[in-house]
């Protein structure tokens, strides 16, 4: 009587030789559909690590397959995707982080913008800081624009909107209090 050997699917591996369980590819696609963050094959291990951190906080979730069930459960989906996004967003931030960009804003962008808008009587500037993390960049912009208000942008009004996928970071940004 012939014996049949059960074949287990071989999981793919990334450049680091780490297993890429196909369920994590589905989670990657779900994250991408939810917020536009895409983890390439080379960076999938970062998503897997974030999923494992989330799984350690959940009862009865011991595998990627279990976690996928949580992510697709209509009652749990929104909260869990938000919590997963809080794990995968980078959150790198500091005041006056990118001097070359501030120089470009000061030397090129604002003078051109002020000239064009003044011609048509518009003296309002709206800025959106997407991916603001804990808010250092939008506060940098506010300080920068207040300095420009004394020179190039007299009589102008400013509005800065700052957003981030990470709710925890946004909560830290709200008070606008920064230490050394």
Task: Kindly give the residue locations of the regions a language model identified.
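Class I S-adenosyl-L-methionine-dependent methyltransferase module
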Residues: 121-180
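Conserved AdoMet
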Residues: 2-128
């Amino acid at each position: 009587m012939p014996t049949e050997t059960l074949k287990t699917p071989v999981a793919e591996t990334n450049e680091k030789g780490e297993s890429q369980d196909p369920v994590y590819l589905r989670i990657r696609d779900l994250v991408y559909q939810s917020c536009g963050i895409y983890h390439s094959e080379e960076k999938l291990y970062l998503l897997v690590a974030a999923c494992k951190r989330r799984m350690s906080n959940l009862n009865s979730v011991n595998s990627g397959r279990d976690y996928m069930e949580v992510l697709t459960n209509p009652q749990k989906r929104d909260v869990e995707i938000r919590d997963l996004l809080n794990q995968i967003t980078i959150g790198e931030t500091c005041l006056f982080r990118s001097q070359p960009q501030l120089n470009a804003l000061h030397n090129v962008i604002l003078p051109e913008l002020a000239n064009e808008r003044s011609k048509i009587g518009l003296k309002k500037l709206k800025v959106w800081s997407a991916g603001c993390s804990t808010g250092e960049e939008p506060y940098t912009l506010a300080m920068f624009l207040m300095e420009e208000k004394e020179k190039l942008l007299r009589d102008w009004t400013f509005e800065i909107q700052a957003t981030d996928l990470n709710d925890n970071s946004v909560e830290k940004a709200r008070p606008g209090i920064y230490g050394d």
